[in-house]
From Swiss-Prot:
Name by which UniProt lists this protein: Disks large-associated protein 2
Amino acid composition bias (Polar residues), ranges on this chain: 242-255, 628-641
Membrane topology: Peripheral membrane protein
GO molecular function, one term: molecular adaptor activity
PANTHER family cross-referenced by the UniProt entry: DISKS LARGE-ASSOCIATED PROTEIN 2, DISKS LARGE-ASSOCIATED PROTEIN DAP SAP90/PSD-95-ASSOCIATED PROTEIN
Organism: Homo sapiens
Keywords carried by this UniProt record: Cell membrane, Membrane, Phosphoprotein, Synapse
Family recorded in the similarity comment: Belongs to the SAPAP family.
Length: 1054
């Protein structure tokens, strides 16, 4: 009890941080009242010798340590990890939340092997010893968290409500049962209120975090979804309010959580890492927090019992049986998950306790509670409860590998769908809330990447068995895949089958396009670590407050998301405001050794961001996407379409690889995207398709496209853009050619994010979607003109029309034109792709023919007023005018006409010829451009209609002249003029007689004076009427056009 003397002061700070906690009973160490009787912090059923009981601050010693027999579980974890479990740092009594060297009675806690069986705190001891460094921060939850480690030792009857454990090593059940007893009953009201009020609920907050999935977990679960949801909303608000504070709070809360988790040696190891990472996370240190990777897993947030379980869930996979094996994995989760609010329990739970309970059980702890606490609340709670948050930082230092896991410690309440390892475990309200997202993650990547990203940094640290047992990698991949799937809905689904319990379909339906865009960007960035530094910096700056400790690895994992954020600061702000949690969740899976996970992580984090962004206007979404994927967006879309075409039209699959035309066209974007894709391809050499998409020969791309068509691993870009729930897999197939596997697809997603988002938002206007439309048009054109396009890679990709129109000899030119057109100054082509009988049109230019073919291909808009239709009108009008001119010229030759009449004839013919040679020609080219999907300034049908209306004025003017000539001819070429005109003409005749040339114009002017006035009046009326009609048409269609035009422009601009 030598430490008992020192402990009081610290315990006063830590154990007694929250009056509520200390009101229950006195902390033996600090003398503050403890919640023992209520069981909030006291671990029910944990009996310690008088000293132990005293030493252990029931409030702060989340009886997980008490429950856990260190002998049973602690030894292996310690020896295995040797971080927090093995090294008995100042032997903090698990019972002592003080985090100080525990009293003598706490020895059992300190030494798992030495732990007395009566003290189920033994496992926690190792954790307290190793973990309690963070404990000082919030020793209550930290130590308590540690307790659940030894589920076997845990006493289900222990007073510590959270410490109720089934005799078996139930991952969540341990903590859930332990805290379920009294804590759940008591803490929920107190802690929930406190957290909701942002009151420092250190112990309660930890209690909430300690919320388990056992009987208590079930109870909490039932109430946690609504309660946690409410808490999550509150936390999100707090999170938004205190992004900057979140960094510190996260660090503190995470560190504390790590402490709490240290109870379990496995957890203790992770707790240590998490402590460091957590404290860093909670603190705006900009350091990646290993716990973050654990924290960031949606599982953490999804688990209503313990958000901290994300890593712990991962660890828990194998931790129950291999509790010692995944201390590493748990450390990060613990540190990250230190402070969480249980859905059912308003109090903050000890993430460590939850993690401890969690670890034994393969099930994933519910993570909604922590997300409720999340950064802002946990931050405050940790500030008050974790005086020694710096200690976790030390642990975090020891857990550098876990820092990547710390990338995103944002509560994943919205992400709830990260059942880290517990696919079997349903994600309570979190999953329900973000079920679609979770399902997106869970369906394809849940099993693979749920935990993988979390322990990605740890994966190096953790033994492969640990990773496997914990299933962290698969979880990380699942998460990554989930995000990718959310981004590229289709591929993710099959990829995340292991985590099918994540019902991501709705989430995917919400965010899948946006997530795809994000994933595409994130993956592109993650894939090309080239942009990692850049994205890291961006991401840091944007999310530093939120991801203070995510710096090193969160940045790596979220490098592309950083770019994405850079792309869309407004979106970033929105994410930080409401989706920081998502971001924080993302990083934990980012560092996973799985490149796909990293990409997915980035993509996921944006996917989560997308959850809100999807509402963001396509322009906003497109801009951010385009910033990174401006070119890739186009090219992804184009690629996807061309892949689709290539797949459908094997003749030019390689050409479909001309996808990278847009890359060529967009140098900066191309450089970035190429780097990203190249990096992705390099990372996924097996998926050389990715690099081949950009860099590899088209043959590879074609083969990959074919493979992807088979595998449905579509490039997210196009898939997402056009995919928006409508053609998820068709696009997917198209892009599938681009990306052979999900990771490649992730790259694709990044590339075509802009288009994806844009198309998703306006998929209804998909035909008018510029980027997507251009790409689709190219695809259709290519299909329509396989013969034409197969010869030119880029041209083929975007269709012969692109080649024809831009006539770039180089793929880059095509790509540039195509990209610009695709992103679309004009969406005309689709609108104007009316099935036109080319025979009726004037001979179209070579490039025009493919456009016609495209129209025939079926890409023409339902509206027949497209370029072909106007060309028909123009052709008919030209023939009519030419007939008039020929007729009048013949009349002038055959008849001896007066100069005045000849002047009229010349005027009419000249006007007609001028009209035909200039305006008609201009309109003709406009129509051709409209039909040319590759036309950079592709006019819309509304543009053509407006121009045609203008032409009608000139045509009417010329027609009036010819009508007058016709009347003169019918009058035997005798001037038939009204008296006024005759009078006027009498005056002018001398002028006409003077110089024929001068006379001609003068005569024309005078002769046209009255008619001109009349014509001008009629013209004005006609113009007004036509303008009104055209305005209505244009306003109706141009709203979409302008949106499409501007959205693509937004994409092109950024």
């Amino acid at each position: 009890m030598g430490t008992a003397q020192v402990l009081p002061g610290i315990l006063q700070k830590h154990c007694c941080i929250l009056p509520d906690r200390n009101t229950e009973s006195q902390c033996t160490l600090c003398g503050e009242p403890e919640e023992e009787e209520a069981g909030d912090l006291v671990q029910p059923g944990i009996s310690f010798p008088g000293p132990a009981e005293e030493d252990l601050d029931p409030q702060y010693s989340w009886s997980p340590t008490q429950h856990f027999n260190e002998e049973r579980y602690s030894p292996a974890p310690r020896s295995m990890k040797g971080l927090s479990g093995s090294r008995t740092q100042p032997p903090l009594c698990s019972g002592h939340t003080c985090g100080l060297a525990p009293p003598e009675d706490c020895e059992h806690l300190h030494h798992g092997p030495d732990a007395r069986p009566p003290y189920l705190l033994s496992p926690a001891d190792s954790c307290p010893g190793g973990r309690h460094r963070c404990s000082p921060r919030s020793s209550v939850h930290s130590e308590c968290v540690m307790m659940p480690v030894v589920l076997g030792d845990h006493v289900s009857s222990s007073t510590f409500p959270r410490m109720h454990y089934s005799s078996h090593y139930d991952t969540r059940d341990d903590c859930a049962v332990a805290h379920a007893g009294a804590k759940i009953n008591r803490i929920p009201a107190n802690l929930l209120d406190q957290f909701e009020k942002q009151l420092p609920l250190h112990r309660d907050g930890f209690h909430t975090l300690q919320y388990q999935r056992t009987s208590a977990a079930a109870e909490q679960r039932s109430e946690s979804p609504g309660r946690i949801r409410h808490l999550v909303h509150s936390v999100q608000k707090l999170f938004t309010k205190s992004h900057s504070l979140e960094g510190s709070s996260k660090s503190n809360a995470n560190g504390t959580k790590a402490d709490g988790r240290a109870d379990d040696h496995h957890h203790a190891h992770h707790a240590k890492h998490s402590k460091r990472s957590k404290s860093k996370e909670r603190k705006p240190e900009g350091k990646p927090r290993p716990g973050m990777s654990s924290w960031w897993s949606s599982d953490d947030n999804l688990d209503s019992d313990s958000t901290y379980r994300t890593p712990s869930v991962l660890n828990r996979h194998h931790l129950g049986p291999v509790a010692h094996c995944y201390p590493d994995a748990l450390q990060s989760p613990f540190g990250d998950l230190s402070l969480k609010t249980s859905k059912s329990n308003n109090d903050v739970k000890c993430s460590a306790c939850e993690g401890l309970a969690l670890t034994p059980d393969a099930k994933y702890l519910k993570r909604s509670s922590w997300s409720t606490l999340t950064v802002s609340q946990a931050k405050e709670a940790y500030r008050k409860s974790s005086l020694n948050l710096d200690k976790p930082l030390l642990h975090q230092d020891a857990k550098p590998a876990l820092r990547p896991c710390h990338y995103l410690q944002v509560p994943q309440d919205e992400w709830g769908g990260y059942p880290t390892g517990g696919k079997d475990e349903e994600i309570p309200c979190r999953r329900m809330r973000s079920g679609s997202y979770i399902k997106a993650m869970g369906d394809e990547e849940s099993g693979e990447s749920d935990s993988s990203p979390k322990t990605s940094p740890k994966s190096a640290i953790l033994p492969e068995p640990l990773l496997k047992s914990i299933g962290q990698r698969p979880l990380g991949e699942h998460q990554t895949q989930t995000y990718l799937q959310a981004a590229s809905d289709v591929p993710v689904g099959h990829s995340l089958d292991p985590a099918a319990n994540y019902n991501s379909p709705k989430f995917r339906s919400r965010n899948q396009s946006y997530m795809r865009a994000v994933s595409t960007l994130s993956q592109a960035s993650c894939v090309s670590q080239v942009s990692e530094a850049e994205i890291n910096g961006q991401f840091e700056s944007v999310c530093e407050s939120v991801f203070s400790e995510v710096e090193s690895q969160a940045m790596d994992a979220l490098d592309l998301p950083g770019c994405f954020r850079t792309r869309s600061h407004s979106y970033l702000r929105a994410i930080q405001a409401g989706y920081s949690q998502d971001d924080e969740c993302i990083p934990m899976m980012t560092p996973s050794d799985i490149t796909s996970t990293i990409r997915s992580t980035a993509a996921v984090s944006y996917t989560n961001y997308k959850k809100t962004p999807p509402p963001v206007p396509p322009r906003t979404t497109s801009k951010p996407l385009i910033s990174v994927t401006a070119q890739s967006s186009t090219e992804s879309t184009q690629d996807a379409y061309q892949d689709s075409r290539a797949q459908r039209m094997s003749p030019w699959p390689q050409d479909s690889r001309g996808l990278y035309n847009s890359t060529d066209s967009l140098d900066s974007n191309k450089a970035m995207n190429l780097a990203l894709e190249t990096a992705a391809a390099q990372r996924h050499l097996p998926e050389s398709q990715s690099s081949s998409v950009r860099t590899s020969d088209k043959a590879i791309l074609v083969s990959k496209a074919e493979e992807l068509l088979k595998s449905r691993c579509s490039s997210i870009g196009i898939q997402d853009s056009e995919f928006p729930e409508h053609q998820p897999y068709p696009r997917s197939d198209v892009e599938t050619a681009t990306d052979s596997d999900t990771e490649s697809r992730g790259l694709r997603e990044y590339h075509s994010v802009g288009v994806q988002v844009e198309d998703e938002k306006r998929h209804g206007r998909f035909k008018r979607s510029n980027s997507v439309t251009a790409a689709v048009q190219a695809d259709l054109e290519l299909e329509g003109f396989p013969g034409h396009i197969t010869t030119e890679d880029k041209g083929l990709q975007f269709g012969s029309s692109f080649q024809r129109h831009s006539e770039p000899s180089t793929p880059t030119q095509y790509s540039a034109v195509r990209t610009v057109r695709t992103q679309g100054l004009f969406s005309y082509r689709e609108d104007y792709r009316t099935q036109v009988d080319t025979s009726t049109l004037p001979p179209p230019d070579p490039w025009l023919e493919p456009a016609i073919d495209t129209v025939e291909t079926g890409r023409m808009s339902p509206c027949r007023r497209d370029g072909s239709w106007f060309l028909k009108l123009l052709h008919a009008e030209t023939k009519r005018m030419e007939g008039w001119c020929k007729e009048m010229e013949r009349e002038a030759e055959e008849n001896d006409l007066s100069e005045e009449i000849l002047g009229k004839i010349r005027s009419a013919v000249g006007s007609a010829q001028l009209l035909m040679s200039q305006k008609f020609q201009q309109f003709y080219w406009l129509c051709q451009q409209n039909m040319d999907p590759s036309a950079m300034p592709r006019p819309t049908s509304q543009d053509l209609a407006g121009y045609w209306d203008m032409l009608q004025l000139s045509i009417e003017d010329v027609s009036m002249k010819f009508d007058e000539l016709q009347r003169l001819r019918l009058n035997d070429w005798k001037m038939m003029e009204s008296p006024e005109r005759k009078e006027e003409r009498k005056v002018p005749p001398p002028i006409p007689k003077k110089p024929p040339k001068g006379k001609f114009p003068i005569t024309r002017e005078k002769s046209l004076d009255l008619p001109d006035r009349q014509r001008q009046e009629a013209r004005r009326r006609l113009m007004a009427a036509k303008r009104a009609a055209s305005f209505r048409q244009n306003s109706a269609s141009e709203r979409a056009d302008s949106i499409e035009i501007y959205i693509p422009e937004a994409q092109t601009r950024l």
